[in-house]
Amino acid sequence: MAEITAALVKELREKTDAPMMECKKALTEAEGDLARAEEILRVKLGNKASKAASRVTAEGLIGLFIAADGKQGAVIEVNCETDFVAKNPDFIDFVNKLAGLVAAQNPADVAALSELAFGEGTVETTRTALVGKIGENISIRRFQRIATPNALASYVHGGRIGVLVEFAGAEEVGKDLAMHIAATKPKALNADGVAAADIAAERSVAEQKAAESGKPADIAAKMVEGSVQKFLKEVTLLSQPFVKNDKQTVEQMLKEKGASISQFVLYVVGEGIEKKTTDFAAEVAAAAAGHA
């Protein structure tokens, strides 16, 4: 049996971020074998999960699922730290199965989803094990489920953009709508659905531009209103020019096809997540200073 030295305990702690006493116990159980001790901690403490939990997850994958009858569907975003892991087969399988689980079980939120049975354990134990296996933090960010008497369509672009659409009409219309939404990324179905904060921000910019133009107050007011209305047309699905025929709007296309859309969900991986940027020059300088 190898001697359990302080240096060995320290090395194991640095690798796993496990408590010092747990590291010592694992090394004792492993008879001083560092690799075996690390495996023991992986099983006991979820491996690197605790260490990885503080790291930013801004990459990831969008999972989509529609039931065989086409009446229930779900879209989910699961994040990881790097694009490399987003292409890992185990990660992809985890995300796609989660989408199916959401559609089938209709959990209230991420916490409820995490407690559901999954494989030989729960969603959370599976996630933790995957963190240990892959070595990156993995987080379930958001999901949405739709159940409808009508029809559902979906589209995923490169695993990073996912769309789920509830509609009534021919199957081709649903596919066209999903692809259009992925391409143009509307904020809402119509003007009523656009967030007040987004409209206020656009109005503020328009007012500043109008003030700088030096135009009379009445003309400036019309300029502001015109800018806001243009913005709403650009970000609302029904008002957008249809991507397959920009001479008609999406609303006109739907009317022509005798179809309608009730709602849509659009997820873009990492949208709104602040990514950590590394200043490598500063990092190297700090490392050099530490060795000075």
UniProtKB/Swiss-Prot annotation:
What CDD domains does the database record attribute to this sequence?
A: UBA_EF-Ts
Pfam families found in the cross-reference section: EF_TS
InterPro entries annotated for this entry?
EF-Ts_dimer_sf, Transl_elong_EFTs/EF1B, Transl_elong_EFTs/EF1B_dimer, Transl_elong_Ts_CS, UBA-like_sf
Q: Is Nucleotide-binding given among the entry's keywords?
A: no
Entry keyword annotation includes Transmembrane: no
Sorted alphabetically, the Gene Ontology cellular component annotations on this record are: cytoplasm
What protein name is recorded for this chain? Answer: Elongation factor Ts
Species this protein is from: Bordetella avium (strain 197N)
Q: What is the lineage of its organism?
A: Bacteria, Pseudomonadati, Pseudomonadota, Betaproteobacteria, Burkholderiales
